[in-house]
Regions:
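Active-site and substrate-binding clefts of carbohydrate-active enzymes
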Residues: 1-94, 98, 195-446
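Short, solvent-exposed turn/loop segments enriched in Gly/Ser/Thr/Pro and often Arg
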Residues: 40-45, 123, 159-168, 322-325
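CE4/NodB-like, metal-dependent polysaccharide N-deacetylase domain
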Residues: 138-162, 272-287
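Conserved short loop/turn motifs at secondary-structure junctions
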Residues: 155-167, 289-293, 402
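Hydrophobic faces of well-ordered beta-strands that scaffold small-molecule active sites
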Residues: 37-39, 119-122, 158, 182-185, ...
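Glycine-rich phosphate-binding "P-loop"
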Residues: 121-144
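Acidic (Asp/Glu)-rich catalytic clusters
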Residues: 31-34, 106-120, 150, 278-279
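His/Asp/Glu-enriched short active-site or ligand-binding loop at hydrolase and phosphoryl-transfer sites
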Residues: 180-192, 317-322
Length: 446
């Protein structure tokens, strides 16, 4: 989730955040804590959940704006004789009201409700670290993210999610210097799909432990042919006039009960497959974006809850990576591991291909400008740099998912950065960038 709080509303902007809160973060509160999991809360998400006035606006959206859009579409469907679709939309609307009730019951403190589950952290604004131009730029992202976690959640074990699972061997020493002791990597191209090597941790010469994610199990959930593509599940891409979803993937009216039953079947299948995967030992790391569960895949939270139940029923032990490290001796990592991500093709092309070369160049130019300024760089310029380094802008542009919004956002932050570095004393750039990176760490040598 990039920093969208205060940067537009609909169709692109902070409504993305409100939607994720209602459909992913709040529903997951009923599942987190039921079994060991490794949860990384990205600092830039926490910045927004902590932003003054953010939860009040989210509640207004849930209580006023969303219900009105539901009402309009329900009336439209009924007028068209689509009573079954209208009934489904009314049922779905009640879930948003329930999310608002939960938020109000916790006093709007969603971050506080998530806090007990936050064990790992990540880079400050989810930058693709191998694409950063300088060691100082990497340290800025990593150390600011760690500082954010420590202030908000206290204890930190040294676990760190690499944004986009993007890893390059040259990062390992920098990560260790910042205090990172464990992270996840995508090594399918190095070991082969389904290889046993994905089930054991690796240790680098520089120090950090690398946990290979298991693409074979992840693909069951997160791929074009994975569980979410089943015909009975709710179609994410087809929607009503006000972007409500009432159809199944197979084109029929969505049947909530049938989809929930299928999610439980898929959970049983998933657990059985993972049990077979680790029958000779090892740790199967199934890493998922939180927003996949509930937002992109509507039934995902039901599936996850059923996975926990099935794991207990089928005898599949669950653990988090911090605990697992105490029971699994890491093997030496090859010094020639490839540069990898969990993006399309397993490489960096999503964020640096010709289609987004202008964005990659803009980010690199901005970083070098801030580094050259060193200690003279105002904090406003550094925060603008962090904002434009978010991996989401190039991802959205590559997939053509948000019109001109990604380029407009990057361009706006680049312009503000240059203005701040110019030293212009016109009051145009006073203060912070909303609540972005309140725990900014700028080394003296930056």
């Amino acid at each position: 989730m990039p920093y969208v709080e205060g940067f537009g509303t609909w169709p692109f902007g902070e409504e993305w955040l409100w939607e994720a809160i209602a459909t992913s973060y709040v529903p997951l509160l009923d599942v987190l804590g039921r079994a060991p999991m490794t949860v990384s809360l990205t600092p830039v998400l926490c910045d927004q959940l902590e932003a003054p006035g953010a939860m009040e606006r989210c509640l207004r959206w849930l209580r006023e704006i969303r219900p009105e859009s539901h009402r309009l579409d329900i009336e439209s469907l009924r007028s068209a004789g689509e009573d079954v679709l209208a009934a489904e939309l009314a049922r779905s609307a009640a879930e948003y009201a329930a999310a608002a009730d939960r938020l109000e019951a916790m006093g709007g403190d969603l971050l506080g409700a998530l806090a007990p589950h936050a064990s790992w952290t990540s880079a400050a604004t989810h930058a693709v670290l191998p694409l950063l131009a300088t060691d100082a730029g990497v340290a800025l992202q990593v150390e600011t993210g760690i500082a954010s976690h420590r202030r908000r959640f206290g204890h930190w074990s040294g676990g760190f999610w690499l944004p986009e699972c993007a890893h390059a061997p040259w990062l390992d020493g920098l990560l260790e210097d910042c205090g990172v002791h464990s992270t996840c990597v995508e090594l399918t191209d190095a070991f082969g799909l389904g290889a046993a090597e994905h089930l054991r941790p690796l240790v680098t010469d520089e120090g950090p432990v690398l946990w290979p994610i298991d693409r074979e199990s992840i693909a069951l959930v997160w791929s074009d042919g994975g569980y979410p593509a089943a015909g009975a599940y709710r179609d994410y891409h087809r929607h009503t006039d006000h972007r409500h979803r009432v159809w199944a993937n197979d084109g029929s009216a969505y049947d909530h009960a049938a989809a929930r039953a299928l999610a439980r079947e898929h959970a049983a299948d998933f657990v059985a497959r993972v049990r077979a995967r680790v029958r000779d030992g090892g740790v199967c790391v199934c890493a998922l974006d939180t927003e996949l569960l509930g937002h992109w895949w509507y039934e995902g939270v039901v599936w996850l809850e059923a996975v926990l139940d099935e794991s207990a029923a089928q005898g599949l032990p669950l653990t988090n990576l911090d605990e697992a490290l105490g029971h699994h001796e890491p093997a030496p990592a090859s010094p020639t591991l490839p540069e990898t991500t969990w993006g399309r093709g397993g490489d960096l092309s999503t964020w640096s291909a010709p289609a987004v070369a202008d964005l990659a160049w803009q980010a690199r130019t901005a970083e070098l400008a801030v580094i050259r300024a060193g200690g003279r760089a105002p904090e406003r310029a550094v925060r603008e740099l962090l904002a434009l380094q978010a991996s989401d802008w190039a991802f959205l542009a590559t997939r053509e998912l948000a019109g001109d919004y990604p380029r407009e956002r990057m361009g706006g932050h680049a312009h503000a950065l240059a203005h701040a570095l110019s030293g212009a004393d016109d009051g145009a750039l006073e203060g912070p960038v909303r609540n972005l990176a309140p725990d900014l760490i700028v080394r003296e040598w930056l």
